Amino acid sequence: MTDLEYQDLAESALTAIETACDRINDETDADIDNQRTGGMITLTFSNRSQIIINLQKPLQEIWMAAKAGGFHYKFRGNQWLDTKDSSEFFTGLSRYASEQAGQPLVFNAPVPVTGK
């Protein structure tokens, strides 16, 4: 994967997270504060716990830090997969965010763009 392809895919993932936070805040009382600084998003929950997602450009990975631990994801096939257990990024984010928010939350992967 080229650096440009990585950047496009990673930025798409971060944008999907921001969009999901807006939707979740509109549809639930989760009240997630999401702040983006460059290639990093910090999600702060009402109990003040956080999930931090950041891009690791030299490794072409996305890293996530949650109360459950730290996780590294690499793009394989058509999704971001954990480098240790191959679990999907947005599935993990949904699980960890639900645990930290104390209610079920769903973060969806961006829809792939075809025809490029």
Curated annotation (Swiss-Prot):
PROSITE patterns, alphabetized: FRATAXIN_1 (PS01344), FRATAXIN_2 (PS50810)
Alphabetically, which GO biological process terms does the record hold? iron-sulfur cluster assembly
- SMART domains per the UniProt record, alphabetical: Frataxin_Cyay
Gene Ontology molecular function, alphabetical:
ferric iron binding; ferrous iron binding
Keywords noted in UniProt: Iron, Metal-binding
Listed SUPFAM superfamilies: Frataxin/Nqo15-like
Q: Is the keyword Cell inner membrane assigned to this protein?
A: no
State one Pfam family annotation: Frataxin_Cyay
Give a GO cellular-component term: cytosol
Record's function text? Involved in iron-sulfur (Fe-S) cluster assembly. May act as a regulator of Fe-S biogenesis.
Protein family according to the UniProt entry: Belongs to the frataxin family.
Query: What PANTHER family does its record include?
Result: FRATAXIN (PTHR16821), FRATAXIN, MITOCHONDRIAL (PTHR16821:SF2)
Q: Which NCBIfam families match?
A: FeS_CyaY (TIGR03421)
Protein name as annotated = Iron-sulfur cluster assembly protein CyaY
The gene coding this protein: cyaY
